[in-house]
């Protein structure tokens, strides 16, 4: 089934029930259906095992962060002392298939576009989401962004990966603090209350190397 042809809406793509009724199904013989189910069950087991592996790697990063930085007496700064904050200017439907540059929106999926507005190292924080499930992406180079995507530049020569991790660790809290009804969103007032630990730069680099190594294990 190719349901994407029925998508409507820019901020929250959706499909009407009447469109589902237009789709047809291929009905295989019963024995063939059983074979397919057996294969799918094996796939589900592999996926579940892989999810457990990824969760364990995430726990390893968190444990390393606590070991290196928790209750060490390092300075703690608020959002506006850490980030230069701006946003993109485009609508989310400005993407182009096979475009030349990454286009960051509030979707977890990375889109493409043929023009760029930024050429830098940055963290990209989704500013709205239907369920308040935000994410943080890292990128260095030329890119563009949706008008509700926060583009974050560090004010000092700090590790982007360290602050990406600290932001990701706060996403559940941000979900709880979200405003809005059908579509949840974040404001600068909410973000401005967040605090970040600022360890020495050599320890930031050490943590970044560790995270990079663990991340490589995730894609093996």
PLM feature spans:
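Non-catalytic DNA-recognition/assembly elements of restriction-modification systems
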Residues: 22-38, 46-105, 193, 197-220
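Short secondary-structure capping/junction motifs at helix and strand boundaries
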Residues: 2-4, 48
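A short beta-sheet element
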Residues: 1, 8-12, 16-17, 105-109, ...
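Compositionally biased, intrinsically disordered low-complexity regions enriched
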Residues: 85, 91-95, 118, 169-170, ...
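Short glycine/serine/threonine-biased micro-segments
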Residues: 7, 86, 97, 178-179
């Amino acid at each position: 089934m190719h349901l994407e042809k029925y998508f409507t809406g820019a901020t929250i793509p959706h499909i009407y029930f009447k469109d589902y009724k237009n789709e047809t199904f291929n009905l295989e013989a019963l024995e063939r259906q059983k074979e397919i189910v057996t294969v799918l069950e094996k796939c589900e087991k592999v996926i579940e095992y892989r999810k457990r592996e990824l969760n364990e790697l995430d726990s390893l990063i968190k444990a390393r962060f606590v070991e290196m930085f928790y209750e060490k007496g390092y300075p703690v700064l608020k959002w506006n002392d850490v980030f230069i904050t701006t946003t993109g200017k485009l609508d989310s439907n400005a993407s182009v298939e096979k475009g030349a540059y990454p286009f960051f929106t509030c979707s977890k999926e990375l889109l493409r576009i043929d023009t760029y507005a930024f050429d830098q190292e940055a963290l990209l924080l989704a500013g709205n989401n239907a369920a308040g499930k935000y994410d943080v992406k890292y990128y260095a180079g030329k890119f563009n962004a949706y008008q509700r995507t926060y583009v974050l530049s560090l004010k000092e020569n700090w590790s982007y990966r360290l602050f990406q991790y600290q932001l990701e660790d706060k996403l559940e809290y941000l979900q709880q603090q979200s405003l809005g009804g059908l579509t949840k969103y974040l404001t600068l007032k909410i973000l401005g209350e967040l605090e970040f630990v600022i360890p020495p730069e050599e320890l930031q680099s050490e943590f970044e190397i560790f995270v990079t190594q663990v991340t490589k294990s995730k894609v093996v």
